[in-house]
């Protein structure tokens, strides 16, 4: 094959490969369009159903309220009518009885006048006596029309106007949720979730973060508050989890629509304390350690992590949930190894902070000092690689200098310094040492 033919063949192969890549990219974009269309149509369908359900429930509730109010007013009418008519009925019975008595008296009087002369005197005497007993000049009092109820209903259009105004402002349709998840960052045994507001007209008062496993249908609350990030812990590594966030506007009680769920996971094993160390009791997840009084009084020991799970670029946090008596040897920190021949992290190949706030680098105390550690204190360690000076370029781990820039934060203060190690390390241990019982520390 000639050189020209080989060149053409090579060009053809490159064109085929480019076409395959182009087709693959287009297919991915078609899939993206399909997902976008599915989201639009799916969310539109769900929104229609939500609107119809809400307004149907509202209509039913308002109708029930109106019917209840109508029945209440009708009952008031019935009560007033009954209370007002009852004395009128009694008066009517009294008058009708008087009319009946007067009719009977008239008949007797007319009969007495028409009787014979011999009976006239007796009949007229009896009639006159009976007429005097009846008291023909005594009449019952009949109330005037102004003294009896004349019922009416006071109705105006203010409720209708107010209802119309409220209905006109009730509900809204948004093309996007007011908040969205901005970033998912894996952390040991968890995922750091960051979110942000995307609606400039929305003023959030609180945020609400939920998560679930990808194979579960039930979300659970992870955080409610004003922060825009939260570390969700106790997640199994290499397991997908879905995260979503919503917000509550200022002065509102209802939550906004949920953000579009984002999938995240962690590949990093959770930070755990080493079990079985004398003088320390661990929680079931091994992320909380409590200094007990099982060891000899006044003699502490260092509790290390179960394995070197801290990597540069991460933030390691110690949170003090209970405190005991302090000792100058107490410490929290990070180290290159897990030596057991020492009772404190204030040693070589370690950086730490003591409970009085003193900072130690390779066993030497720095001049800078942080606030003392008490209940509720959170101490953070951040590290980044500054420089690497290996002796053997073919094997960097074989001797040389390894420099890390360390930032220790406590309270509202922090110290920054360079930590020189004599070997390159991919990961580091963390540890704590307390001389007296009562201390409890959570690591994450």
Swiss-Prot record:
Q: Which residues form a coiled coil?
A: 1-65
What SUPFAM superfamilies has UniProt attached to this entry?
Fibronectin type III
Q: Which cell locations does it reside in?
A: Cytoplasm
The primary site where this protein sits is cytoplasm
Matching CDD domains, A to Z?
FN3
The entry's cellular-component GO terms read: cytoplasm; nucleus
- Domain Fibronectin type-III: start-end pairs: 177-270
Molecular function in Gene Ontology: DNA binding
Record InterPro entries: FN3_dom (IPR003961), FN3_sf (IPR036116), Ig-like_fold (IPR013783)
Q: Which UniProt keywords apply?
A: Coiled coil, Cytoplasm
Q: Which family does it belong to?
A: Belongs to the cytokine receptor-like factor 3 family.
> What is this protein's function per UniProt?
May play a role in the negative regulation of cell cycle progression.
The protein's name? Cytokine receptor-like factor 3
Organism of derivation: Danio rerio (Zebrafish)
| Gene that specifies this protein | crlf3
């Amino acid at each position: 094959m000639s050189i020209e033919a080989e060149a053409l063949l090579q060009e053809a192969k490159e064109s085929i490969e480019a076409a395959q890549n182009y087709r693959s990219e287009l297919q991915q974009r078609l899939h993206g369009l399909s997902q976008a269309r599915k989201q639009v149509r799916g969310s539109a369908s769900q929104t229609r159903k939500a609107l119809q359900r809400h307004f149907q429930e509202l209509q039913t509730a308002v109708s029930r309220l109106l019917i209840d109010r109508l029945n209440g007013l009708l009952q008031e009418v019935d009560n007033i009518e009954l209370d007002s008519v009852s004395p009128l009925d009694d008066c009517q019975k009294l008058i009708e009885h008087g009319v009946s008595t007067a009719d009977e008296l008239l008949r007797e009087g007319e009969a007495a006048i028409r009787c014979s002369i011999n009976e006239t005197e007796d009949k007229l005497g009896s009639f006159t006596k009976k007429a005097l007993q009846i008291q023909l000049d005594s009449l019952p009092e009949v109330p005037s029309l102004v003294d009896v109820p004349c019922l009416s209903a006071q109705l105006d259009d203010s409720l209708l106007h107010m209802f119309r105004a409220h209905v006109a402002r009730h509900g809204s349709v948004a093309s996007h949720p007011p908040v969205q998840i901005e970033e998912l960052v894996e952390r040991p045994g968890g995922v750091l979730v960051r979110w942000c507001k995307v609606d400039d007209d929305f003023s959030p008062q609180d945020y609400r973060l939920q998560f679930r496993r990808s194979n579960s249908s039930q979300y659970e609350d992870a955080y409610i508050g004003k922060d825009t990030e939260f570390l969700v812990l106790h997640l199994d590594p290499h397991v997908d989890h879905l995260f979503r966030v919503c917000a509550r506007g200022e002065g509102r009680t209802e939550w906004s629509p949920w953000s579009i769920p984002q999938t995240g996971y962690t590949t990093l094993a959770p930070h755990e304390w080493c079990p079985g160390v004398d003088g320390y009791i661990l929680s079931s997840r091994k992320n909380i350690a409590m200094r007990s009084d099982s060891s000899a009084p006044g003699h502490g020991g260092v509790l290390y992590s179960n394995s070197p799970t801290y990597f540069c670029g991460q933030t390691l946090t110690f949170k003090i949930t209970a405190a005991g008596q302090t000792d100058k040897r107490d410490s929290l920190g990070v180290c290159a190894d897990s030596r057991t021949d020492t009772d404190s992290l204030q040693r070589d190949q370690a950086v730490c902070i003591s409970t009085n706030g003193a900072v130690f680098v390779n066993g030497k105390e720095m001049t800078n000092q942080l606030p003392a550690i008490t209940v509720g204190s959170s101490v953070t360690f951040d590290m980044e690689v500054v420089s690497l000076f290996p002796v053997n370029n073919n094997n960097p781990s074989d001797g040389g200098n390894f420099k890390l820039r360390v930032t220790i934060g406590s309270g509202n203060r922090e110290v920054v310094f360079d930590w020189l190690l004599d070997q390159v390390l991919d990961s580091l241990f963390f540890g704590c040492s307390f001389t007296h019982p009562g201390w409890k520390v959570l690591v994450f």
